[in-house]
Amino acid sequence: KNQDTMKVLPAQVDIDLTNVCNQDCYYCNSLDHRTNMPVQKKYTEYIDLIDKLATWRIHSPKSVGTLHTVTFTGGGEPTLLPNYERVVEHTIDHGFLTSITTNGFKLEKLLENVDYNKLRKMGWIGIDIDAGEEELYEKIRRTISKTSTFTKVMENARNLVSVGVNVDFKILLGE
């Protein structure tokens, strides 16, 4: 290796935590990906990855750029990774601007297990909502639940906002 080569570092990294999903959205473009790659890593592997990424935050004369932002997303639902909230907290602890793109159904684990002061340091939690009313939401998301998924997602969003977390609602437009 040539030690004089400059490294170009990204400002942001997106990490797919899992391919598992708890919804069956009619428009999903990840279904084939989820079906053919159902393997899920352990949360400790993501903790190790965040530790490695933290070394990219150190300024060096041999690198251009600094990693600032980590966004958790997935070919599935990132909050379904067991102990995902520990990975999120670890990322915040390393000083990364941390965000999650989610369907919003399992966000209560963040509120139950991560200090609110840490949660307030997050960049945002982006909730894919797709509809502003329950009946259409349930039709698009094709969820199977004894209770309203829409109601639970809205409750999770309200609870996060009430402690100062920046929540963004995202929609997919189509015909």
Task: Name every feature range the model reports, one short phrase each.
Residues L81-E175:
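Conserved AdoMet/S-adenosylmethionine-binding subsite of the radical SAM
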